[in-house]
C-alpha cells in the first residue's frame, strides 16, 4: 500500500508541475521587437504578435529599461491620431493580435538609457485570464532600427482630412 501512495503522490506532483508550466507559457509570441532610440529620446514602442489558446487580456507590461511601460492604442479623434493608455487589450482565444507601429503597442516611457540597435531587453507581459487570475510572461526582445522581415506593417492612419 505505501508504494501505491508514493506513486499517487508522484503522479499528483507531475500534474501540478505540468499545470504550473502551462501557466508560465500562456501565449505564443512572434515577431517581437523594440524600436531603437537615439540619445535624449524619452520613449519608444515594443511590437509583436500574440496568440493564446484561451481568452486573455493584456493588462500591462514592465521592463527595467523604462520608468513607465503601458499598453497603448492609437485612436482617431477628429482628424488627429492620438495615443492613449489601454487598461486591457483583449486577446481572443486562437486569434492573433498584432501590436504595430501606429496601432496598438507597448509604450516604453522615461527611458533610463538609449536603446541601441542590436541589443536585447527584457519585457514582462502582465495578463489576466477569464477568472481574473494574474499571469506573467517574460521575454527577451531584440532592439532594431526597422521591423524584422515578415513583421506586420504599421497600422494605417486613414484619411486625415482634405
Where are these regions (language model features)?
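Absolute protein N-terminus
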Residues: 1, 22-23
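Bacterial N-terminal signal peptides that target proteins for export
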Residues: 1-10
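N-terminal signal peptide c-region/cleavage motif recognized by signal peptidases
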Residues: 17-19
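Compact, glycine-rich, soluble single-domain proteins
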Residues: 24-162
Amino acid at each position: 500500500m505505501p508504494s501505491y501512495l508514493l506513486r499517487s503522490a508522484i503522479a499528483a506532483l507531475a500534474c501540478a508541475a505540468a499545470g504550473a508550466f502551462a501557466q508560465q507559457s500562456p501565449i505564443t509570441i512572434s515577431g517581437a521587437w523594440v524600436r531603437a532610440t537615439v540619445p535624449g529620446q524619452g520613449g519608444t514602442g515594443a511590437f509583436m504578435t500574440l496568440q493564446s489558446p484561451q481568452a486573455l487580456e493584456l493588462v500591462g507590461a514592465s521592463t527595467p529599461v523604462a520608468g513607465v511601460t503601458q499598453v497603448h492604442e492609437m485612436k482617431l479623434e477628429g482628424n488627429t491620431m492620438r495615443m492613449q493608455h489601454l487598461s486591457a487589450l483583449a486577446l481572443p482565444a486562437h486569434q492573433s493580435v498584432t501590436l504595430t507601429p501606429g496601432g496598438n503597442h507597448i509604450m516604453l516611457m522615461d527611458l533610463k538609457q538609449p536603446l541601441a540597435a542590436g541589443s536585447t531587453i527584457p519585457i514582462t507581459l502582465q495578463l489576466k485570464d477569464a477568472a481574473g487570475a494574474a499571469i506573467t510572461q517574460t521575454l527577451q526582445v531584440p532592439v532594431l532600427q526597422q521591423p524584422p522581415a515578415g513583421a506586420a506593417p504599421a497600422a494605417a492612419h486613414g484619411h486625415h482630412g482634405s
